C-alpha cells in the first residue's frame, strides 16, 4: 500500500479528532516514513513522536490561507490530510462554523497556491441527512442534505460543497473525500459513545432506526489507503450490515427510555443546554430515520474490506463501556 | 347464542352461515348493487352485532392466545402490557433491510387467521412463482388499508413449496409514522425507490410492487376493479434493468373490505396521510370502523413475463417502457375481470 514517493511531504491537519490521533500514530509507526507534519492549535498529547514536526497555526485567523500556503511551500508538501472536521457538535456553533467552513476554505486556497497533488478529507455520512425518504443504502452520488437544521451537519455539508467545487476547478489535485459512518471503538469519543455512558438513554417513541457503524481501526485503515493510494472521488467508509438502535442499547445494558418525538426535541435541547445531553435536539433526526450508506464503492475501488461488521464494531464499543463502568465502580 | 361455540368447532368457513353475518352480508350486497337503498341505521345495528360475534369467534379460534404465546407475554398488567408493546418492536436480529424474522413469525398467526378464516383466500397459480432467483410480483392494489400485500405475502409463504419470503415496497409516507414505519420495516417492507428495488433484486429476492400506489387504494367504490395508471413505469424499467421476470397477480375481494365513499384531503393534511377515508363504517364507528369487511378473496398468480435484454439506451426509451407498462396493466386488468366474472358472491364462497 505504500510507495516511497507518496510518503514525502505528508501534512495532517487536525491532531485532536479521533481519526487525526490514530492517523498520526500509524504514520509514526510506519518505517517507510521519515518525517511528517502536523498542523493544529495544540500539539498532540498522546504518546511520544520522533518523526512528527508540529506546526502551530490557527486556521481561523485572518490571512491563515496565505500563511498556510507559505508553510506548505516551505516544507515541500505534496499530500494534505484534512482531519479537522469536528467529531462532536459544539456548544459554540459560531466557532465551529469558523473552523469547519472558513478553515476548510483557507486550506483549499492554500492547497491551490502551494500546488499540492493530493488532498484527503475525513467527512461523515451524516451529510446525507436522516430522512424517511432516503433509500436503505445511500450511494455516494446521492445529493447532500439541502437544509440541515443542525449547525453540526450544516457546516459539514458546507465544507463538502467547497471541496466539490475544488474538485471540478483543479483537476490536477487528486481529492478523496471519505465519508465515515459513526466511528466506534475503545478510543472513540463522540456524541454516540457519550450516549452510552449514561444509564438511561432517551429514544424516540415509535421509532427504531437501523444504525451503521465503522470500527476505528477499520476507519484509520481506510484513511491510510486513501492517503497512500490513488483513489480520487467520494467514498462511503462503513461497516457491513446494520443494527437497530434498541438492540444496541440492550446490548450495552442501557435503559431505553422512549419519549414522544413532540416532547423529545425540546427536552433533549434543554438537556444539551445544561450540558447533560451529548447532542442537541436537532440531531435527534439521526435517531429517528434512516441514514445508512452504501459501502460498495470503497470495497470495489479501494479494495477496502472492514474487519468489523457494524454489529461487531458496536459490540467492541459496548464491551469497553462495560469495562470502564466496572472500573469506575471499583 | 349457543351457536357460537359450535361455530368454531365446525369446519373452516362454515361459521359464515351464522344468521347475523348472513344478514349483514346480504344487506351490504344489496347496497353494492343498489346504492340508493342504503339504510345506515340498519347497517350500523347489524355491524355492531357482527363485531360482537366476531369478538367471540376470535376468542374461540384462539388467535389472541396464539399471538400471546408467540410473544411470550405473561399475565397482562397495565404496565406489563405497555412494556410489552414497547418491546414488541425491538429486534435482536435484523437483516440488511431491517426484516426481523422472529418478530414476523410472532405476528403471523393474526394474518394466518385473516387468510384462512376471515377472507378465506383461495390461491391459484402458485407454481408460477419461481423456487429461487429474483422476480418482481406486480399486483393490483385496493382496499384503503394494504391487506392485499399481507395476503399475497402469506399466500406465497404458506402455499409455495419453497416458502419464499416476499418483500414489498412501501410508500415513503409510512416511514414518517411512529410504530407503523418500524412495523412495516420489520415484516419486510422497504421504502419504494429504484435504489432499494434494484439492490433487492440483485440479491435474488422476491419483491412485490403495487404500481397503482396510493391511487389504487384510494379509488372510490364506484371505480372498483378499474386499474389506475401504473405509476411512471418504474416496475417495467426495473425488470428490464435487472433482467427479472414480472409475475402478474390479480387480487379480487380486497376492493370491498372498506368501500370508499368519499376521501378528504383537507382532513388528511394535518394527519400527514395521503387521504382521509370515509366508508360506511369509518369514521362513524370509531376504531371499530377500521375493521375490514369479511369478503371472500381470490388471488390469481399469472404466468411470468420475461423481457429481452436491452441496451442501457433503450432503458431510457420512455415510449418502450410506457408501452410495456400499459401491456402489463391490461394483463392484470384482464385477469381481474375474469375472476370477477367467475365470482358469484362478494361474501360467500359458494
Give residue ranges: language-model regions:
Chain B
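Basic, polyanion-binding surface patches
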Residues: 6
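C-terminal terminal-subdomain/extension
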Residues: 292-350
